[in-house]
């Protein structure tokens, strides 16, 4: 009797790690981008939570007037924030080891720069991971393309704008009231409401909300009956079923009669592409607008542009907005300037 011994191939630890990282059988896909995403987002999240709760006040304007942002220093969820890195640091790379002490690093707002840089790497890696998983599953790459819109928006307010203005202190604070302050000061200094790219972003966000509500309500109103009156309509759908769960012809007919025929999509694929593309393109434009205004290419200025036959100014809404801008401008960073307006 001949015994045949089959030699088992031994794979290296690295090969097994590579197989595990790129496996689509895992409950959560890791991927090579995930190897960057997981540590960076964990770091950003951990430091944000600690700083939001316990960070001491930060000298944001570099004039020895610290601004409190954490819960333990008197703030609540609405007023609290991680305060941006000090204007005294500017755009310098400011890790913990660059400061003379931990107290100095905290006083100069080091946590903000740490959070923003790790968060930026993390969301870029998340976008790459979306593409990577789509590639492994043989899907098209448009999920990552759609996600590039919020990535571009975050990059604009956390990275591009501080670079253009010359200091991380001009970045958006990581909190609710801080975000509102950023928006108000941005309007005062750049007149963003009069910038066409911001207008496209507003059309993208509100239009996307409208189209989402229209699509959801049309589909929900044209479901194919599979249940009795006493059952939930949701019970009429079985995950993975091949047949349509709603009547697109009925939805098309309804909307075509409500508006006009060609306002209604008769192709489900082109409809869903439109639903994705509209808000994404709008947010792309807003991010591009923030990035141009970062370098002081600002919104339209129509101030005092309408005169009567005697040469007297007839105020328009543009003039009203300009007066509001001036008021916001002179109120912000009130102790940092020797002049009523920034000279930048």
UniProtKB/Swiss-Prot annotation:
GO BP term, example: response to herbicide
UniProt-annotated site: Stabilizes free radical intermediate, residues: 190
PTM info: Tyr-161 forms a radical intermediate that is referred to as redox-active TyrZ, YZ or Y-Z.
Binding-site positions, chlorophyll a PD1: 198
Transmembrane segment boundaries: 29-46, 118-133, 142-156, 197-218, 274-288
Residues binding Fe cation: 215, 272
Organism domain of life: Eukaryota
Modified residues (Phosphothreonine): 2
Residues at which [CaMn4O5] cluster binds: 170, 189, 332-333, 342, 344
Binding site for chlorophyll a ChlzD1: 118
Molecular function GO labels: chlorophyll binding; electron transporter, transferring electrons within the cyclic electron transport pathway of photosynthesis activity; iron ion binding; oxidoreductase activity, acting on diphenols and related substances as donors, oxygen as acceptor; oxygen evolving activity
HAMAP family: PSII_PsbA_D1 (MF_01379)
Subunit structure: PSII is composed of 1 copy each of membrane proteins PsbA, PsbB, PsbC, PsbD, PsbE, PsbF, PsbH, PsbI, PsbJ, PsbK, PsbL, PsbM, PsbT, PsbX, PsbY, PsbZ, Psb30/Ycf12, at least 3 peripheral proteins of the oxygen-evolving complex and a large number of cofactors. It forms dimeric complexes.
Name assigned to this protein: Photosystem II protein D1
Organism expressing this protein natively: Pleurastrum terricola (Filamentous green alga)
